Structure formats: C-alpha cells, structure tokens
A protein has these predicted regions:
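Glycine-rich phosphate-binding loops at beta-strand->alpha-helix junctions
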Residues: 93, 148, 278, 282-313
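Glycine-rich phosphate-binding loop and adjoining helix at the ATP-binding site
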Residues: 115-128, 132, 138-139, 148-206, ...
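Short glycine-rich, Thr/Ser-proximal phosphate-binding strand/loop in the N-terminal lobe
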Residues: 75-125, 166-168, 232-260
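Short beta-strand scaffold segments in enzyme catalytic cores
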Residues: 94-98, 146, 223-229
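Anionic-ligand binding region
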Residues: 212-214, 221-242
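Glycine-rich phosphate-binding loop plus the immediately following alpha-helix
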Residues: 176-200, 232-273
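Short linear motifs in low-complexity or flexible loops
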Residues: 10, 14-15, 20, 24, ...
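Short glycine-aspartate micro-motif
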Residues: 84-88, 137-141, 214-218, 288
Length: 330
C-alpha cells in the first residue's frame, strides 16, 4: 500500500449500475456481526489473512500525475489561463475553491454543511453562495453523489432524504431530482460553462496517471468509484448501491455510519475485504483509495491490502475539477 499526498460524465451512481453516456459541457444499522465475515468468496477470510506488505510513500514525495494520453489538443492552448471553480458536493458538506489550468488550488476553500432537506434548487443556490465568496472563474465543475448523465441527475442517494444519509426518503425529492438538468441550472446561476459529474469521477481525474486501467474508490459518507482506461473514463458499474448481504449495500457496509459504530480497526478490515472482493472483478493496474475516510484506514490493514493500491488525499475531489475538462472520450 502506498500513500500519495498531494469523470467524466458517467451514467452510474445511485442505482447500482449504468453506463457512461458521454460528456456534456453546458454553456452559460446496529449489527453486532460482520455480514461478510466468511460469507462470500473474496469478501470473507480470517481477519489475519496475509497480504503484500509494501512501503509507505511520504506526502512530500507526491508529484502531479502525468498528463493522460488522450487530451483534446484544441483545449491545451485555450486552457493556459483558464480558471475553474471546483465544487465538491458530499453527503455531509459542500466545499468549493478556484483552480488554475493545471488543477492547483489558487484560492482558499470555502465550505458549508450540506443543508437538508435538499431540493435541486437549494443545491444550486448553495453553490452560487459559495461561488460568491471566491474569485471569479471561467468555468465550473460540480462533483456530486449519484448517477449523472450529460449533466442530468438520473438518481442521487443522499439528497432525496429528509435529514441526510439513512434518514427517511421523501417522495417529493425523488421526483424533483429525477432527470434534473443540474448542468444547465448551475450554468444559468453562475453565467459560466459547467460540467457536472459523479464526485468519484472528479476525484479520479485528479489522480490517474493515464497508464492502464486505473480505478478509484472514495470513502466518505458512503462509497464512490470510477474507472479510467489509459486516462479516459470508462463505462463502469457503480458498486455503492450494490447488495452485500442481509439487504446491506456497500454504502451501508463501509459508509461513515458504520465506521462510527464499529471503530476504525474493524471498519478498516471491512475496507480491505471490499478491496479483495473488487480486485478479481476489475483486475485494475492500480486502485486509488480516496475520500475523507481513506486516511482512517489503519496501518495494520494497509500492510495487507496490496501494493497495487495507493491512498490519495481527499483534496483530489477538488483538484480533479480542472483536469476532467480535458479528458477525451474514446
């Protein structure tokens, strides 16, 4: 396990499956038993199961990923002075900052708790409020949980609830969010081009090297993921809402509620088992573990998780906001 200190529009997220449909730029539980302990191949196994022990890469050894192979040549010169407002919308908080053309943060980040209940218009207003506290930008990237296609929200797991994750789902919010054109709404509110993506895709854009098949799993309020093939966002199944056992989803199994209930040691063991389960499904060249909770994985589990896995900083959810504009489609 290594440490690094430091999508583009996929149709996957809250529904548990989907396809990448292309990129559109808009103008203008209390459970005492681990359900996966020995329950399924690849997910079980004894807690002391051995894995590869690898070295730690210190935070100051981090260098920006190399440029993906497939970038739109026409955007390279145009992007020299382009600034991007990057907004990371999570289940517990929403933060924003301004990036230069290379994805470097050039303004202090501003943050606000995610306001619930949260209809689409309220999220747009929240983004506009954060933007008003920052320098002006040429374009905006919004990363948010859920299935996003061409900037349109197909489904979102958190924002349809009364008080946030694991609270009651409100039918009116399900209807309001279904097929809401978030990209167009944000562009109208801010008066600049917008790109609205799944939040794991934005984070992945900030860390991938452009070599081989790379996957990111983000650990926060829930679980997010994205897959990149030679620097290009690839069609992928969103595992967060996939079933584990006893009606649990992966969000339930290793989300923030379970981490708080179990403690970091037991929760970290679950994370390792999820990685072990996903590895034969994706056969990645490299897996990145990001999100706010990636830093909470214990050293004991990091030592067993494999040298094809790298922990990356939570800031990737922000810094990827610039790079994802230049990621070409196959």
């Amino acid at each position: 396990m290594g440490h690094l200190g430091g999508g583009v529009d996929a149709g996957v997220g809250a529904s548990g499956h989907g396809e990448t449909d292309g990129l559109t730029q808009h103008g203008g539980q209390g459970r005492g038993e681990d359900p996966l302990d020995g329950a399924q191949p690849g997910l079980g196994g004894p807690p002391g199961e051995e894995g590869a022990v690898v070295g730690q890469v210190e935070a100051d050894a981090w260098h920006a990923p190399i440029e993906p192979h497939r970038l739109r040549a026409s955007t390279r010169l145009a992007a020299v002075s382009t600034t991007t407002l990057s907004v990371d919308c999570g289940g517990g908080g929403i933060k924003a900052s301004v990036l230069d053309c290379e994805g470097n943060i050039i303004s202090r980040a501003v943050r606000t708790p995610t306001p619930y209940p949260l209809p689409p218009e309220k999220l747009v207003e929240t983004i506009a409020s954060l933007a008003s506290q920052l320098p002006g930008a040429d374009r905006v990237t919004v990363g948010m949980p859920g299935m996003i296609r061409h900037g349109v929200v197909v489904a979102t797991p958190h924002y349809i609830t009364k008080d946030g994750p694991r609270s009651r789902v409100l039918p009116d919010l399900v209807e309001a969010w279904g097929r809401f054109d978030m990209g167009a709404a944000v562009s109208r509110a801010l008066g600049i081009p917008s790109l609205v993506l799944n939040d794991a895709e934005v984070a992945g854009a900030g860390v991938v090297t452009g070599h081989g098949l790379e996957m990111i799993v983000t650990l926060g309020t829930g679980l997010g993921n994205a897959v990149f093939d030679n620097g290009v966002l690839a069609p992928h199944v969103e595992v967060s809402q996939g079933p584990v056992r006893w009606g649990l989803t992966y969000d339930d199994y290793i989300g923030e509620h379970e981490r708080l209930r179990l403690g970091d040691a037991h929760w970290s063991r679950r994370v390792r088992r999820v990685v072990d389960a996903l590895r034969p499904m994706y056969l990645w060249d490299r897996l990145y573990l990001g999100g706010g909770n990636s830093r909470r994985i214990t050293a004991a589990q990091l030592a067993k998780i494999g040298d094809d896995v790298v922990v990356v900083p939570n800031e990737a959810g922000m810094t990827g906001g610039a790079r994802c504009w230049d990621m070409a489609r196959p």
